[in-house]
Amino acid sequence: MSHYKNKFLCRRSSVKCLSLFLSLYLTLAPGFAFALPSDPTVRNGSVSFNQVDSKTLNIIQSSDKAIIDWNSFNIQKNEATHFQLPSANSINVSRVTGGVSSSIFGTLTSNGKLMLINPNGILFGKDSRVDVNGLVATTSDINNSDFISGNYHFSISPEINRTVINRGTINIKQGGLLAFVAPGVENSGIINAKLGQISLASGKTFTLDLYGDKLVSLGIDSKILNQVIGPDGTPVSSLVANGGSIHANGGNVFLGVKAARNVVDQVINMDGLIEAQTAFKKDGKIVLLGGDEGLVKITGTLDASGKESGQLGGNIQ
């Protein structure tokens, strides 16, 4: 098999330039199954794509904000996708429009903030590793002009009933943020965000506050009315579930739901670990918000204690 490097530059209103390279690569290597993010269209901003080899894709963004529509966004085991952004506060929106869910089984990295949107669901597999400054993974969408203007309001079609699930390891840089928002959200892996903000929320509409104390605010019309379907095609038993471990020492962790009665057995199931201990003299905070119509089941560990002598610790609500 031939090995080579190629680059393509895409700007606003560009053609789907990377697809030309992918077609050429598959022609030269007919036995190869390509699974990296494919067929991008840049809707806003300046972005280039560097296909390093058969398992590595680099996305280089030179504008502070950019929007890319992808036909598919998958990363298989032993594959890697990296987003290089101008700064830690720069943001990339990657929206999947091809009608299939996203499976992240390899490595996803960025020095900035990524917003991954797929109405058909997102799964981070058990061998996946994510290292970013910030990550928003959601089945809801945002208007392009709202994103560019800084109005981070997301909404979802009534028929969407899919999930965002993490079974791997996600590391958020110190002081960064992570938000999973979908009709169903689950963490059975590891999430680390020291001094950061973590939100796992079930809802249809929400607003992001990237710089305030409350990362995710669920809309008043955000209530889940229908069964939510997991990646295996069966209904989920909880709208927000944490059976893994979440570490946000010195930061905030929020688990929230807006749901109608009898949609699931329990709206929140917390049988894992949430740790938001005091760090660098900053108290941690853990909030579980189940609404008025659902059962919040806690059989795991919530820890917002002080780590050092004399520290009182944060609070749990």
Where are these regions (language model features)?
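Extracellular and secretory-pathway beta-repeat/beta-biased strand scaffolds
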Residues: 2-317
